[in-house]
Amino acid sequence: MDARGWLAAGVLTGALAGCGGSTSTPSPTAAPSTPQGLVVGPARDFGDACRLLTASEVQSATSVGPVTPGSSKDPQLGSYCTYRPAAGGSSVPVLTVQAVTEYSAAAARAMVDQSGGPTLSGVGDDARAAKPGGLGSAVYLSKGASYVVLSSIHKDVTEQALEKLAGTLAGRL
C-alpha cells in the first residue's frame, strides 16, 4: 500500500475512533500520524493536466465528437483534467487525466507497476493498460518523476484510443 493509501486508511480509522464516545480531548500539540509513521504531504505541483492533451486530440482519438476540458486540483492526488462532451447530453466524461509529480522516477514507476496490467512498450519510461474494477479502461504511465493516469468509462472510448493518447501525452512530459 502506498503512502496515499495509508493516509486514507488512517483518516478512516481516525473517523471511526471519534465515534467511540470518549470524553477525553486530544492534546492540542499532538500531530496527526499515519500508520507506520508515514507522513503524506501535499502532492508536488504538476501544473495544469489539461496542457498535456488538446481537446482536438481527444476528439480525434476517441471519435465521440467535440469535447471541453475542465481542470481541477487535489492537494493530495495532483492535477486532473476531465474532458466532457461539449454538446452536453451525457454526464459521463469522455476522458480523465490525472497527473502528479512523485518524489523520484522510481516512485513513479512503482505507482505504474501497482496497476498490474499488461505492459505497453514505447510509452514513457513505464506504462501499463488496465480495466480498473472492470469498468472502462485506463493507462498508467510514468516518465521521469511524472505519474499520469488516463482513464475512461465512456462506452465509445476504446483501449486503443487511450493507448494512442498515452503515447502523445508521454511525448510532452
Briefly describe each language-model feature range.
Residues 1-17:
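Sec-dependent bacterial lipoprotein signal peptides
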Residues 19-30:
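Bacterial lipoprotein signal-peptidase II cleavage site
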Residues 49-65:
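Amphipathic alpha-helical segments
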Residues 65-74:
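Surface-exposed patches in mature extracellular/periplasmic domains of secreted proteins
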Residues 78-105, 147-152:
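A short acidic-to-branched-hydrophobic micro-motif
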